[in-house]
Amino acid sequence: MVKYPTGSVMPLRAAQRQGKKALLKKASFSDRGMTLEQQINESNQYYLDAGIAVVHKKPTPIQIVKVDYPKRSRAVIREAYFRQASTTDYNGVYQGYYLDFEAKETRNKTSFPLKNFHEHQILHLEQCLDQEGICFALIGFMTLERYFVTPASFLIQAWQNWKAAGKSSMTLAEIEANSFEIKSGFCPALPYLEAVDRIIADRKQEHGNK
């Protein structure tokens, strides 16, 4: 029997059947084709459930415009707008390392437009790198079904080249040469921590395995 916090119970067989249904539902959802954000969120949940890492999507800030108070103890938001996020999409902790990254997708097949990033995001990644954080962009070429973990150091350099010389995109070849490609799967949907392991290994090698 499975006992819930409310005190209700469910026979173990029924609970197992329910778990199988949830698994099948998740599998069919994956087959339909998820957005990059959905794949990352599902991966983060897998990492959390498995005790591997704690990574969450940062909430989008909201500007509240109008609030009604039908009761003195209760407020009802009548009008609100999403504001532009001030930093990046995701952050968390993995094996004692702080992770901070932005997720971007494109339908392009040969390049990724740098205009998809905002200047404040690049600045934030740069600041986190200065504090020894593991920072990157998770880029999805959705038409090609290819995914890359691009270290922030290369992204920052590409951004600076755009501002200085007008080169407004990263070619697929450049991303291939300066990123870690990951393959989509089932559990997790996007195993981006495999690339993070390689970033950590490279950093240790640069610092003499300290």
From Swiss-Prot:
Keywords: Cytoplasm, DNA damage, DNA recombination, DNA repair, Endonuclease, Hydrolase, Magnesium, Metal-binding, Nuclease. Signal peptide: none annotated. InterPro entries: Resolv_RecU, Restrct_endonuc-II-like, tRNA_endonuc-like_dom_sf. GO terms for molecular function: endonuclease activity; magnesium ion binding; nucleic acid binding. The keyword Nucleus does not apply. Mg(2+) binds at residues 87, 89, 102, 121. It holds the Pfam family RecU. Its EC number is 3.1.21.10. Binds 1 Mg(2+) ion per subunit. Its cofactor is Mg(2+). Coiled coil: none annotated. SUPFAM superfamilies: Restriction endonuclease-like (SSF52980). GO terms for cellular component: cytoplasm. It catalyses: Endonucleolytic cleavage at a junction such as a reciprocal single-stranded crossover between two homologous DNA duplexes (Holliday junction). The record marks 104 as: Transition state stabilizer. GO terms for biological process: chromosome segregation; DNA recombination; DNA repair. It is found in: Cytoplasm. HAMAP family: RecU. Endonuclease that resolves Holliday junction intermediates in genetic recombination. Cleaves mobile four-strand junctions by introducing symmetrical nicks in paired strands. Promotes annealing of linear ssDNA with homologous dsDNA. Required for DNA repair, homologous recombination and chromosome segregation. Belongs to the RecU family. This is Holliday junction resolvase RecU. It comes from Lactobacillus delbrueckii subsp. bulgaricus (strain ATCC 11842 / DSM 20081 / BCRC 10696 / JCM 1002 / NBRC 13953 / NCIMB 11778 / NCTC 12712 / WDCM 00102 / Lb 14). The lineage of its organism: Bacteria, Bacillati, Bacillota, Bacilli, Lactobacillales. The gene is recU.
